Amino acid sequence: MAPKSSQSSQGLSQRSKQQTISSFFTPKPSQTPKAPPKPAALAVPNGADQDDDDDEDEDIAPPRQLTPARKRSIDEQHEDEEAGRSSPPKRVRVANDEPRPSLGNASATTLNAAKPPKITERTSKFLFSSSPVVRDETDAKDDAAATQKLREKLHEKFVKKLGRPDSFAELRRRNKVISEDNGNGEEGEGEEDEEEEEPAPKPTKGRKGAATKKTSKLTPMELQYLDIKRKHMDTVIVMEVGYKFKFFGEDARTASKELGIVCIPGKFRYDEHPSEAHYDRFASASFPVHRLQVHVKRLVKANHKVGVVRQLETAALKAAGNNRNTPFVRKLTNLYTKGTYVDDIEGLETPTAGAQATGYLLCVTETNAKGWGTDEKVQVGLVAVQPATGDIIYDDFEDGFMRSEIETRLLHIAPAEFLIVGDLSKATDKLIHHLSASKTNVFGDRSRVERVEKPKTMAAQAYSHISNFYADKMKSSQEGGSEQGAILDKVHQLSEHVTICLSAMITYLSDYALEHVFDLTKYFQPFSARSYMLLNGNTLSSLEIYQNQTDYTSKGSLFWTMDRTKTRFGQRLLRKWVGRPLIDKERLEERIAAVEELKEGEHTIAVDKVKFLLGKIKTDLEKVLIRIYYKKCSRPELLAALQILQDIASQYLSAKTPEQSGFSSILLSEAVSNVPKIYEDVNSFLEKINAKAAKDDDKYGFFREEFEAEDINDLKLSIASVEDDLNTHRKDAAAKLGKTKVDYVTVAGIEYLIEVKRKSVEEKKVPASWQQISATKTTLRFHTPEVKRMLQERDQYKESLAAACDTAFKRLLDDIAAKYQSLRDCVSSLATLDALLSLATLANQPGYVKPTFVETTELDIVGGRHPMVEQLLLDAYVPNDVHLSGDATRALLVTGPNMGGKSSYVRSAALIAIMGQIGSYVPAESAKLGMLDAVFTRMGALDNMLKGESTFMVELNETADILRSATSRSLIILDELGRGTSTFDGVAIAEAVLDYVIRDVGALTLFITHYQHLARLQDRFNGELKNVHMSFEERDGGKEVVFLYEVAEGTSHRSYGLNVARLAKVPEKVIETAEVKSSELEESMGISRVANMARMVKGLLEDGGEEGLERLIEGIEQL
């Protein structure tokens, strides 16, 4: 017998070799008992028992089954191929010479006695025996030889059927790829429930590193995806697969995070990294086709660039074509970013979330003009485009090191996306980062930033690019030569920096198929046209023009107060008016007259008609028109827009001239007379459309029959012919089944099924050529070969018809786009009516009055109120007067207790001036307003850590900018200038600035301060400066102060900061200590003042000069 140690060493040597396929299918010796011995008399000759031998082989060593399909196919092939081949003799255990004792005549002792010859080595350990059974060495050798023969036989069989064992995993992957290449070219296309991908096979416990040698084979669809992805690595790609959209790799992880959809594990990288060698597919995530815009919008809002890859072939046409075994042709059809997303169908009829969401894409470039540090000057060019409406703003300007000019423009435009051409200076870069990087920024949401290179020859390239762009547009347009020349002249007059931005913007938007927006040169507008009041960034923020300073929402802002519009395009126009008050008195008078006419005729037929028609508009017509121009409009959208325009135009058919409009105001009469001009065009478009089909988005019935194209009509007839043949085929099918009549049924979307009852006479008559499609316990459902052929033919016609219908729809959109300008002018007129009606609704609020405008620079407001605080307060707002004039009192020095209402008072004056020049009524008893060219503010105490500037540095920078920019027609508001440094320095700077503003600039000024020392400046300026304070009452010995919020003449000598501390719930112990220290300081200051006066009296007695007498009187007044 072989010793146990030698057997174990033999097993180790076998395991050290590479495992064969047969080793996976052969049971381990410890798990499978040996077959019982057979009597020798039952043996048969080899040739006569061939099949039995094969069966016995499987009984002895049944292979381990991976999948039922594979086991079955292997067995069948094994039986077929081994039928005619001889096999080696079967090993049969030889019986002992002695007869076996039967159970009947055996004694208990004999039965229970150990029988060593009958006990194997494997079972000996389970016996209650003290010593192991010793086997005969000859039997052990025979067993080993037979087992080795059996293994070799199985090994040969599997090598013959499957190739080398170590290539089994590769074969399985190859089979999977072949199955995907058949039919549609990739897995699961056109199926509703795609099969789950099989996980990669686990590496075998063989040689070290065996798993890393396996290389994955990507499917044709994944290779197609990789090809597109490599060209757009910065884009989240979503690919159409059947009627699902799929993300792959890292994009799947991004989509799972942003959209909350499941990510199926797999490769995340695109470079075949060894760390992901155990995966044979990309990670993926998917959603249904009809949810595309919902998910794209969410990704775009999260600042991702999204690319949509669509199938350009249909299943039926592909099956009939020559490329039926290749993947579907796919192409990147759409790109979206925050500034270029114009497919927001869902949001057209919903109320706007916030006024700051303007959707502008802003392109900016910059060069150093001169200097560096605080003397740095940069030349900035910008172009801002609103793709959703077609508006374009451009500007070219010089800016200082504070970047106040560019900040003003950014706050006005509030872009959703930046396109930066070349490198920007650190100051500009930090400003853009500061304004755009936070979710709670002044734009209301984080903005996306894209950068492009700027070569040294960019200016020349840009000029050439723009010239070619517009020259090509002119060739394909229908405009006359003079109009073409005018457009080119207008473009060539743009400055170098604007030209660079325009060229970069055209190139950038070409990727999104939105470059057509630049065809509309009529809507190019310069930002810095001097027909508007300048409201810089600080003013917009301090006066809360567009959003409050608490949570950066529109509630509590001036725009929120004035917005009573009924349409989205009217709201956008009013937002522009609020940020750009007029300084042209003639235009301002026209606007205010229109508001007055609407206010006075509130319940007249003409005004009620305008309100009613605007109230009916639930569609954003301005956005729909530009989507028509881009050819991105849907059928229901188009129908709704055309029907609204037709309805409104039909109401004013009798008002084709301004005189027939029913209004006396120029603005109103011109706006109303513009509306009916589009009636004939809109009517001609609607005549071609089947309203019911368009509403249901039915492309096949979209056009009325008399306006259908010939190819559409032919394809419809072909489909009808096939369906007629299908109906006729029922007689043939009935004859084959022996029935008089057969009806088609539709189950689970599968049409033209023929049902046959189980166990019926008809079931036996079903031809073998009929294909069973589905079945139940009682019914079988079939397609005949003729039905299959005709259905395939019908599907081809249907898909050709769909393509023809899309082409015809595009032609209609082209025809409408040719009339874009007249349609846009009509919508602009409706927006003007809506904005004017909003101002008229505000004017009807109690306490609002029509302002009077004068040529001189003055503010004469009686009973003025803060427009936003008044609406938010539950109590009545206390009105105050403001009297400023360039000829008389030019500045007010405002003092008073903390929280006494100083800031609210000066803000109300500025807001009333702005509202008046917007063309609105104002919250006051009366208001006489001069035409201001700008409002400047320096309010609040903020540092700027991004620029490394302290609070005091920010104060002085902003103040210096105001002093450089202000004119005698400006209004300046300075709030507690100098508080960021020591008292002496602060007083000195505040006095110097106030002196400069009054003497040199001559602007109207409201100056808030707590420095009583400045009050003595009143006498220096001979009535140009006046002291006022916010009145109050002291109670309980000065411990309690009641704020009256009324402006009174004179100076407040105390700020009552300790009372504010009590209101803020500062601990009483702290307040008591502060009171003691305050008394001590006041006493020491009083003593020093008395000593100073004593010296002044002494000097007066010695010198007797008038100058010493004046200083003595000032000192006595301060006491």
From Swiss-Prot:
Gene3D superfamilies: 1.10.1420.10, DNA repair protein MutS, domain I, MutS, connector domain, P-loop containing nucleotide triphosphate hydrolases
First and last residue of the signal peptide: none
InterPro entries: DNA_mismatch_repair_MutS-lik_N, DNA_mismatch_repair_MutS/MSH, DNA_mismatch_repair_MutS_C, DNA_mismatch_repair_MutS_clamp, DNA_mismatch_repair_MutS_core, DNA_mismatch_repair_MutS_N, DNA_mismatch_repair_MutS_sf, DNA_mmatch_repair_MutS_con_dom
Biased segments, Basic and acidic residues type: 134-148
An MF annotation (GO) of this entry: mismatched DNA binding
Biased segments, Basic residues type: 204-215
Location in or out of the cell: Nucleus
Segments of this protein annotated with the region Disordered: 1-148, 173-215
The keyword Transmembrane helix is assigned to this record: no
BP term (GO), one: mitotic recombination
GO cellular component, one term: nucleus
Keyword DNA damage included in the entry's annotation: yes
Alphabetical UniProt keywords: ATP-binding, DNA damage, DNA repair, DNA-binding, Nucleotide-binding, Nucleus
Domain of life from the UniProt record: Eukaryota
Composition bias, Acidic residues: 49-60, 183-198
Region Mispair-binding domain, annotated ranges: 212-339
Matching NCBIfam families: PRK05399.1 (NF003810)
The protein's assembly and partners: Heterodimer consisting of MSH2-MSH3 (MutS beta). Forms a ternary complex with MutL alpha (MLH1-PMS1).
The protein, known as: DNA mismatch repair protein MSH3
Species this chain originates from: Phaeosphaeria nodorum (strain SN15 / ATCC MYA-4574 / FGSC 10173) (Glume blotch fungus)
Lineage of the organism: Eukaryota, Fungi, Dikarya, Ascomycota, Pezizomycotina
